[in-house]
């Protein structure tokens, strides 16, 4: 099931990203740049290891993990978080915890597109990616 997520995905639509970034504490200047950026996400599956690379002119990140195993992550906005990713009903659910807070990043495939839903408290952002050929 995870194999379906593999590929190179380009951001084509983003809703409420600024509200989400404000909610997790991202500063004004960083939000301005991040809002203008159209990142590419590359998802690779290598046995039981999943690699997610996010590349943009703003910042590039890479995480490597196994489903259900907690790992340390430094986010694009430099938060140091404890993360765990699980597969739940065909969705990749990524939970990040830091300083008594938590946020979820849920990736799901809908009509051939990758939908990323970011949630922190009442802030909900939806980012839509299309697969590159």
Curated annotation (Swiss-Prot):
<feature type="modified residue" description="Phosphothreonine">
    <location>
        <position position="8"/>
    </location>
</feature>
<feature type="modified residue" description="Phosphotyrosine; by Tyr-kinases">
    <location>
        <position position="20"/>
    </location>
</feature>
<keyword id="KW-0007">Acetylation</keyword>
<dbReference type="GO" id="GO:0036041">
    <property type="term" value="F:long-chain fatty acid binding"/>
</dbReference>
<protein>
    <recommendedName>
        <fullName>Fatty acid-binding protein, heart</fullName>
    </recommendedName>
</protein>
<dbReference type="Pfam" id="PF00061">
    <property type="entry name" value="Lipocalin"/>
</dbReference>
<feature type="binding site">
    <location>
        <begin position="127"/>
        <end position="129"/>
    </location>
    <ligand>
        <name>(9Z)-octadecenoate</name>
    </ligand>
</feature>
<dbReference type="InterPro" id="IPR000463">
    <property type="entry name" value="Fatty_acid-bd"/>
</dbReference>
<feature type="modified residue" description="Phosphothreonine">
    <location>
        <position position="30"/>
    </location>
</feature>
<keyword id="KW-0446">Lipid-binding</keyword>
<dbReference type="GO" id="GO:0015909">
    <property type="term" value="P:long-chain fatty acid transport"/>
</dbReference>
<feature type="modified residue" description="N-acetylvaline">
    <location>
        <position position="2"/>
    </location>
</feature>
<comment type="similarity">
    <text>Belongs to the calycin superfamily. Fatty-acid binding protein (FABP) family.</text>
</comment>
<keyword id="KW-0597">Phosphoprotein</keyword>
<dbReference type="GO" id="GO:0005634">
    <property type="term" value="C:nucleus"/>
</dbReference>
<keyword id="KW-0813">Transport</keyword>
<feature type="modified residue" description="Phosphoserine">
    <location>
        <position position="83"/>
    </location>
</feature>
<dbReference type="InterPro" id="IPR012674">
    <property type="entry name" value="Calycin"/>
</dbReference>
<dbReference type="InterPro" id="IPR031259">
    <property type="entry name" value="ILBP"/>
</dbReference>
<feature type="binding site">
    <location>
        <begin position="127"/>
        <end position="129"/>
    </location>
    <ligand>
        <name>hexadecanoate</name>
    </ligand>
</feature>
<comment type="function">
    <text>FABPs are thought to play a role in the intracellular transport of long-chain fatty acids and their acyl-CoA esters.</text>
</comment>
<dbReference type="InterPro" id="IPR000566">
    <property type="entry name" value="Lipocln_cytosolic_FA-bd_dom"/>
</dbReference>
<dbReference type="GO" id="GO:0005829">
    <property type="term" value="C:cytosol"/>
</dbReference>
<keyword id="KW-0963">Cytoplasm</keyword>
<feature type="binding site">
    <location>
        <begin position="127"/>
        <end position="129"/>
    </location>
    <ligand>
        <name>octadecanoate</name>
    </ligand>
</feature>
<feature type="modified residue" description="Phosphoserine">
    <location>
        <position position="23"/>
    </location>
</feature>
């Amino acid at each position: 099931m995870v194999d379906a997520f593999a590929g190179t995905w380009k951001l084509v639509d983003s809703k409420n990203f600024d509200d989400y970034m404000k909610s997790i504490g991202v500063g004004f200047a960083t939000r301005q740049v991040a809002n203008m950026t159209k990142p590419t996400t590359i998802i690779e599956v290598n046995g039981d290891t999943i690699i997610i690379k996010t590349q943009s002119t703003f910042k590039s990140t890479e995480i490597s993990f196994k489903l259900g195993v907690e790992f340390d992550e430094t986010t694009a906005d430099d938060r140091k978080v404890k993360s765990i990713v699980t597969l739940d009903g065909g969705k990749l659910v990524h939970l990040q915890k830091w300083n008594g807070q938590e946020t979820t990043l849920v990736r799901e495939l809908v009509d051939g597109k990758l939908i990323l839903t970011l949630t922190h408290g009442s802030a909900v952002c939806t980012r839509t990616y299309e697969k590159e050929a």
